Amino acid sequence: MLALLLTGIHVQAQKLKPSELAHTFSIVARDSKTGEMAVGVQSHWFSVGTSVSWAEAGVGAIATQSFTNKSFGIRGLALLKEGRTAQQALDQLLADDEGRDVRQVAIVDARGNVAAHTGKKCIQFADHITGDQFSVQSNMMLTDKVNSAMAEAFKASSGMPIAERVLAALNAAEAEGGDIRGKQSAAILVVPAKSEGKPWEERTTDLRVDDHKTPLVELGRLLKVQQAYEHMNAGDLAVELNDMPKAMQEYGTAMKMQPENLEMQYWTAVTLVNNKEIAKAVPMFKKIFKADKNWKELTKRLPAVGLLSTTESELARILAL
């Protein structure tokens, strides 16, 4: 294991373990328009997102990698909450860490300040580039072109949602060779500009691919799935506001994005029934039940809990499909 090769690196008070290895490329960034903050990462190591990426709404985003000090995530965010800038927080973290020479860290705070550090004993190619409200960093890369590719891709995608910009940067890094060992896992984490005091709701995007032959491809697929579900959620909100045309528009967009997703079709059909549009719902139910009979069984159970409002005869018509 790579950790066994570190005997020549004297790191006092820090016992390096294989679980702390995250030789990788990443980006931390803030959207100048929305204020959202994000971390994106890919590595040839299992479940990299659980070690490298940290973010909190209204506070900042942190990537901690190379020979990872996970505490930098929690402690760094705490320092930002105390009012430190990204640079001040980074300086404090490094001052307390005798393993700083093998660390790579980047921080963006809620005001858009950026700070980054690449230890002098990080494995080459290793470096970072900071720009306007973003930082890209990498170590153990195949070539020295990875960081510049990430930076240019992020800047070129201005105007797109931050999650898509982060993914574009990661794809650009991989196109330049990426991690010299290959690829295994990836993650994107996005948080809002401000906190509403509900941390359980304050991760706009939280996607991880822990073990995959092409993790960025899979991460991109998951991002599209999430976007489809966001349209479903927007449709649900429109129903609550009694705006059925808007609801059906949102549901329709979601189903076009995920045409094989029976769940989206099913709840759209249920909404139609609840809105007294059973004629439109029937062909949808017929298609769904043919694909998977369990949805018919579920339909029987919905009236009892108030999720399907219909007459007995209409319910019988649906169940007879």
Question: Predicted segment positions?
Answer:
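Short coil turns that delineate tetratricopeptide repeat
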Residues: 259, 293-294
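Residue-level recognition of tetratricopeptide repeat
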Residues: 236-237, 270, 304
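Alpha/propeptide regions of enzymes that mature by internal proteolysis
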Residues: 14-181, 210-243, 256
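TPR alpha-solenoid repeat register
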Residues: 264, 298-299
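Canonical tetratricopeptide repeat
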Residues: 233, 267, 301-302
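Register position in tetratricopeptide repeats
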Residues: 240, 274-275, 308
